[in-house]
Amino acid sequence: MGSIVVMQNSILADTDVLVDFLRGHEKAVAFISEFSSRIILSAIVVAELYAGVKGNAEPAVLENFIFLFRVVPLTTEMAKIGGLYKRDFGKSHGVGLADAILAATADAEKAELKILNVKHYPMLSGMEPAYKK
């Protein structure tokens, strides 16, 4: 008899979750460790991570970390949907463009978006933080 393989959705991790992991926060380390085989990164998240790099050694550490995951490039469709999310939720909910594009990327990839600040994602229903701080 053959075995049944259950495919699980990818997990698109937000920058805050990854920064917590890189800083050694226990809950983030546990989260990334548990789901590492399913985690994907958005090109936007990669840009945000590099924007926060300090010193000369950190870029190499960050590059090695990013290499562990599949990075989803930004497509025109993701940019369009992200722009519409920003238009629709930017003023009313304080949604920034990066968060809007991240939500659009999760939609396009059919991925679970794992974040810390659910207020940034009113366009996605049922959002829960990846872990409680």
PLM segments and residue spans:
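Nucleotide phosphate-binding site architecture
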Residues: L18-V19, A47-Y50, P122, A130
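Acidic catalytic patch
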Residues: F69-K91
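Generic structural signal for small/hydrophobic residues in well-ordered secondary structure
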Residues: D14-T15, L49, G82, A106
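Acidic donor-binding loop at a coil-to-helix junction in glycosyltransferase catalytic cores
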Residues: L97-A98
